[in-house]
Amino acid sequence: MDVNPTLLFLKVPAQNAISTTFPYTGDPPYSHGTGTGYTMDTVNRTHQYSERGKWTTNTETGAPQLNPIDGPLPEDNEPTGYAQTDCVLEAMAFLEKSHPGIFENSCLETMEVVQQTRVDKLTQGRQTFDWTLNRNQPAATALANTIEVFRLNGLTASESGRLIDFLKDVMESMDKEEMEIVTHFQRKRRVRDNMTKKMVTQRTIGKKKQKLNKRSYIIRALTLNTMTKDAERGKLKRRAIATPGMQIRGFVYFVETLARSICEKLEQSGLPVGGNEKKAKLANVVRKMMTNSQDTELSFTITGDNTKWNENQNPRMFLAMITYITRNQPEWFRNVLSIAPIMFSNKMARLGKGYMFESKNMKLRTQIPAEMLSGIDLRYFNDSTRKKIEKIRPLLIDGAASLSPGMMMGMFNMLSTVLGVSILNLGQKEYTKTAYWWDGLQSSDDFALIVNALNHEGIQAGVDRFYRTCKLLGINMSKKKSYINRTGTFEFTSFFYRYGFVANFSMELPSFGVSGINESADMSIGVTVIKNNMINNDLGPATAQMALQLFIKDYRYTYRCHRGDTQIQTRRSFEIKKLWDQTHSKAGLLVSDGGPNLYNIRNLHIPEVCLKWELMDKDYQGRLCNPLNPFVSHKEIESVNNAVVMPSHGPAKTMEYDAVATTHSWVPKRNRSILNTSQRGILEDEQMYQKCCNLFEKFFPSSSYRRPVGISSMVEAMVSRARIDARIDFESGRIKKEDFAEIMKICSTIEDLRRQK
């Protein structure tokens, strides 16, 4: 089905074609090798922006630290991180004046959250720096390891299950003279293989205990591991992102909860909302500025870009903001919230894996770990790397660089948005006290500024004043990358505004196509993506119909399930033809079994199994939806599943789709190669957690999910639940007396075993 692309644009206004200029087709670029170089760039740049600050030495770790706060005022347009404390505090005061009670109310909301949040909040999130093993781990494993090591050292507050109690353990751990940790190691030995009589290397994995003194422990607790950000489109160079450890995560979560609560109450904030809600918020601000610019006034909009937002922000400034925001709150609450910025102003950036060297004839490869960079002879490196290493050397301690100024990517998005909005707030006429005034939108480091004035000179003066105000707060608007237009045309967080928002369809392109989960989920996700784009992104009926046909084609090629009456030969075609011939009602076969496609743009909301159920042969229904079918390892499927789709910018988002459990909902098995590596012990731990959690969910299904209250272990909670359920089932006659007795006996046995342990 070939389509002439020009046909798509016959009736499209020029500005709607913006999406064709976006770099979103094809695969995004991924990084390979180590992120060490990118991390060194970040550390060096951050220090360069703040170079005229004051140097001090951290008393606990001995790390040199640069403090640019209240540094010299800028004399040129170069980006700097010299935020002025009094200016930040004043901006906060004005923000509160414009929104009476905003900080007070947000603090009360946050206090409630702090008291109710459970430790398992920290299991969300992907990679986390596991300080016990000195490498990245899935969040759940890293948390479990941390709690296990805390328990070894007599820190058991977290057993209450509240996050705030876990944080008490973290605080106490910092005061301990030494911490004992359990770490993994591997032994290699050469043994003779009985079968082949050859020598082979055998690896065994062990756990060993190790003691860390106070200094080493604190360094690890303050360490952020770094990785390269993958799949970033439209950039020539890669950049580093940070993965913090478990000690920092909980504190950051509470600060961000407070900041999120404030952002929700600010009309200029592009966070935490998204999608259509965000567009509505933006449209409101634009409408306000347009209606208020009377016939005599001009209105211009800057599509803004800030230079190195993260590297010029400063945790000390965030501490000042939090101190102000929480000034009338209880002492304990102020302390909890001030710890995250304090930890960040003493942070260490781990340099990653180090460098890989190859000899000229490619015979020898060797890895130089980051720990060795402080002492190695620099003649082996090329010029640019040599300069980087020389610059960073004074900051190195055990393969991590002291990085006091700057915020690593993505850490305090909400709080930095509050800072940005506080400047937009200063643009009201009553504050500018002159003929020009401004308003705008802020979402993390992205902003749009709308300036109104009587003439062009006034507009220029307004922009200049905004620019200088930003400088005082450590924000550097880029004059090269920001551009100004008559209000009505601008871009903000990749939303294009042209008298209303233009659908930027190319952004959704990466999520079209076959996801590769399994036949059942892929069909469902594919049609849901098309449905969602018809609702949200101006995907017209003709294009949607075409997208659907292309998707079905793609799906059939992926799973080799061409129609039973096709001429295409694949590995599956023999079986599919056989099924086709013996099926009475061919329309009832799923597409993945060689059936016809019954989807059109009117019925995309119906799962395929439901769409075809009435058309299926009885025996086909029986095979398709049979939980006892031996060829399928079933996971229990909720009625709604979540798929991860890749939008063009921002993190992968989850998308709900309807899931009907059939024999096509298989789950692929884990790759075996991991079982021979040092990760094996970790994998076993992970499977154990998985099993425990699954078991727990069986006892407390989400429909009746009330958290077991009080300090009871998972086992105690499950045993007591089993007893209650058994009694109810017995009394209502659902189970026999013998079954009831057996359940009670098993429960007692479990309790006895626990006591003996």
UniProtKB/Swiss-Prot annotation:
The keyword Phosphoprotein applies. It is found in: Host nucleus; Host cytoplasm. A motif (Nuclear localization signal) lies at residues 187-195, 203-216. Residues 249-256 are annotated as: Promoter-binding site. Residues 55-64 have a biased composition (Polar residues). Its EC number is 2.7.7.48. The keyword Isomerase does not apply. It catalyses: RNA(n) + a ribonucleoside 5'-triphosphate = RNA(n+1) + diphosphate. Residues 52-78 are annotated as: Disordered. Gene3D superfamilies: 6.10.140.720. Signal peptide: none annotated. Influenza RNA polymerase is composed of three subunits: PB1, PB2 and PA. Interacts (via N-terminus) with PA (via C-terminus). Interacts (via C-terminus) with PB2 (via N-terminus); this interaction is essential for transcription initiation. Interacts (via C-terminus) with human PKP2 (via N-terminus); the interaction competitively inhibits the interaction between the RNA polymerase subunits PB1 and PB2. This is RNA-directed RNA polymerase catalytic subunit. The gene is PB1.
